[in-house]
Amino acid sequence: MESVTFEDVAVEFIQEWALLDSARRSLCKYRMLDQCRTLASRGTPPCKPSCVSQLGQRAEPKATERGILRATGVAWESQLKPEELPSMQDLLEEASSRDMQMGPGLFLRMQLVPSIEERETPLTREDRPALQEPPWSLGCTGLKAAMQIQRVVIPVPTLGHRNPWVARDSAVPARDPAWLQEDKVEEEAMAPGLPTACSQEPVTFADVAVVFTPEEWVFLDSTQRSLYRDVMLENYRNLASVADQLCKPNALSYLEERGEQWTTDRGVLSDTCAEPQCQPQEAIPSQDTFTEILSIDVKGEQPQPGEKLYKYNELEKPFNSIEPLFQYQRIHAGEASCECQEIRNSFFQSAHLIVPEKIRSGDKSYACNKCEKSFRYSSDLIRHEKTHTAEKCFDCQECGQAFKYSSNLRRHMRTHTGEKPFECSQCGKTFTRNFNLILHQRNHTGEKPYECKDCGKAFNQPSSLRSHVRTHTGEKPFECSQCGKAFREHSSLKTHLRTHTREKPYECNQCGKPFRTSTHLNVHKRIHTGEKLYECATCGQVLSRLSTLKSHMRTHTGEKPYVCQECGRAFSEPSSLRKHARTHSGKKPYACQECGRAFGQSSHLIVHVRTHSAGRPYQCNQCEKAFRHSSSLTVHKRTHVGRETIRNGSLPLSMSHPYCGPLAN
């Protein structure tokens, strides 16, 4: 076993020194001086590192860029002043009391090397390497470039049965500083052929990675996650500086790009790239570049809010962080670290290969268990599964309506608040959704980007194009579960269902009359305003609806474009053709819920329902007599305006209805 040096038992702080309070700094000072005394009493090299000399004079060590453990060779035992140091018990009690007040946080990163008292067996000369002289007698430090085990300690609340103090081990390479490399050259010159380090296996990035579980990760704030990112990038750079070939893992690319910890679905930590192969020389930035940029932050220059600290010298392009600067340098240089072998597309990070490979190969690894529909991403599968379960997790607190997605709930809340944040810059009309604003703006520009491939007709909305295409294919995918009637659009099915439920959600503010659709309500409002928009060019009749005008125009032209395929009879309106088609099929989709009697037309069902309710909604204004049908009321009114005399031969008959007998005088 080799001799134990001061570096083996030292507690090294890098960026964590600022997180320590005065009690912990004093504890660190006492601990390092105590280790020096212990090593001196065991016959360790009689030299005191410069950082310990400064610890004896002040409570803080050098900064990271200057705080290298340097062996100066100056006698130091006489300079120790233990009476100036506080009691170990007092420091521990004070530190423990402060620990209880600290919240969850990443506050320490120390090298955990067992002290001399904690070793199972004391060091003997037989355990040391077979050397003729101790290493310090040859004028060298006896240190070697070894992998020191580090541990990140995170206090988090208890998760189940787990210990609230969670620790993850990792190995971080302790690089030889410049002064140590000079001593090694001198050592090799004085003792050629002398072994200075034991043989070790190659260390991969997976060996030095610190991994947190998702439960642990959520308890870290932004400062702690930033510290974690810096530690991981430092580990990688240290490995890259000593390894001949080291490919950047996919997870590290995510870490550089987002500053977030990777998850298991992003890839396993590995020292080799997944297919396709990666070029290590292009994937690893130079250590000089890292040192140059890191020195900016070490000097204490803090960017102001909104200021971009890092600049690329080639184009003076500013950057907020280090990682985009490296990526920009590679983009400017035209480098590409990874290349897809099949489609020959190059990517700067190997993780970017995932999406092109899925698109190219059509990989859809997430399949639905119910309909066997597959998706590329798990988030799409979760969203799709809600269509089967009909799960509506997001409830409106005002009206109780439930929605499947939170975005739909947010849009719905605007109907209660009346908020319309999206306003047209030309006409000032406002909308609740940005998509509706985009569609509205096409009315001003006349843009119709959606064109039918069959007939060339263009539309300004994709939904209008889809509905139009179904007129060519004859597809009616939306079918009523009660009567079996099919529709081309889902909105038409929703309107049709109100004929079964008798729901009329749209009510007139002036007279209170309800309607099934908003279109019918808008038409009704014109009765109060007297507005009539559509005028017949032939007879001058003004109509309130465009569809009514089209039907009216056919009375002048005699056009009957709707022909029955069975008997050849033609009709001027599609509704008349549908009613006629039921005479051939015998289909009666409208059934009475009380007696079960079925009818071929909804109007016949409405009239029949009044026989059960004894409702007579049509009342005469003069005699207040009520009728079930409007036609009966019309016939009744003729008795008040006078009798119509129809002569049949010489016998005058007073008739008010063609099916009624003669009325008494």
Curated annotation (Swiss-Prot):
Main location: nucleus
UniProt keyword annotation of Transferase present: no
SUPFAM superfamilies attached to this UniProt entry: beta-beta-alpha zinc fingers (SSF57667), KRAB domain (Kruppel-associated box) (SSF109640)
Chain positions of all zinc fingers (C2H2-type): 366-388, 394-416, 422-444, 450-472, 478-500, 506-528, 534-556, 562-584, 590-612, 618-640
Tissue expression profile of the protein: Highly expressed in heart.
InterPro entries xrefs: KRAB, KRAB_dom_sf, Znf_C2H2-type, Znf_C2H2_sf, Znf_C2H2_type
GO BP, one annotated term: regulation of transcription by RNA polymerase II
Domain KRAB: 4-74, 203-274
Keywords associated with the record: DNA-binding, Metal-binding, Nucleus, Repeat, Transcription, Transcription regulation, Zinc, Zinc-finger
Any one cellular-component term (Gene Ontology): nucleus
Subcellular compartments: Nucleus
One term of GO molecular function: RNA polymerase II cis-regulatory region sequence-specific DNA binding
Its job: May be involved in transcriptional regulation.
Name of the molecule in the record: Zinc finger protein 333
Species: Homo sapiens (Human)
Gene name of this polypeptide: ZNF333
